[in-house]
Amino acid sequence: MALTLADVDKIARLSRLHLTAEEKEKSLQELNDIFTMVEQMQTINTDGIEPMAHPHEAALRLREDEVTETDRAAEYQAGAPEVRNRLYIVPQVIEE
C-alpha cells in the first residue's frame, strides 16, 4: 500500500498541520517507508511463537510484604508551622 500526496494532504489537514511542499514530500517518503516495513513484517511466519509483552526474560525479585519503614509523620511535621489531625495547614490561596 503506497500513499500519495493527496493522502498526506488529508492526513495533514485532519491533524491540523501546515506542511510545506518539501515537508509533504519528506512525509510521503517516510510514511511509505513505514508501510513497506510493516508489509515486510506481515510476511514473517509467526506460527507457534508465543506472544510476549517484552523481548527480555525478566524475573522480578519480590520481597515479603512486611513494613520496612516506621511511621515518621510526627518527626516530619515537627517543623511545620501548623498541623491538625496529621494534616499540614496552609494559608488559603483561592477565594471562594
Curated annotation (Swiss-Prot):
Allows the formation of correctly charged Asn-tRNA(Asn) or Gln-tRNA(Gln) through the transamidation of misacylated Asp-tRNA(Asn) or Glu-tRNA(Gln) in organisms which lack either or both of asparaginyl-tRNA or glutaminyl-tRNA synthetases. The reaction takes place in the presence of glutamine and ATP through an activated phospho-Asp-tRNA(Asn) or phospho-Glu-tRNA(Gln). GO terms for molecular function: asparaginyl-tRNA synthase (glutamine-hydrolyzing) activity; ATP binding; glutaminyl-tRNA synthase (glutamine-hydrolyzing) activity. Heterotrimer of A, B and C subunits. InterPro entries: Asp/Glu-ADT_sf_sub_c, GatC. This is Glutamyl-tRNA(Gln) amidotransferase subunit C. The keyword Zinc does not apply. Pfam families: GatC. Belongs to the GatC family. It catalyses: L-glutamyl-tRNA(Gln) + L-glutamine + ATP + H2O = L-glutaminyl-tRNA(Gln) + L-glutamate + ADP + phosphate + H(+); L-aspartyl-tRNA(Asn) + L-glutamine + ATP + H2O = L-asparaginyl-tRNA(Asn) + L-glutamate + ADP + phosphate + 2 H(+). Its EC number is 6.3.5.-. GO terms for biological process: glutaminyl-tRNAGln biosynthesis via transamidation; regulation of translational fidelity; translation. Keywords: ATP-binding, Ligase, Nucleotide-binding, Protein biosynthesis. HAMAP family: GatC.
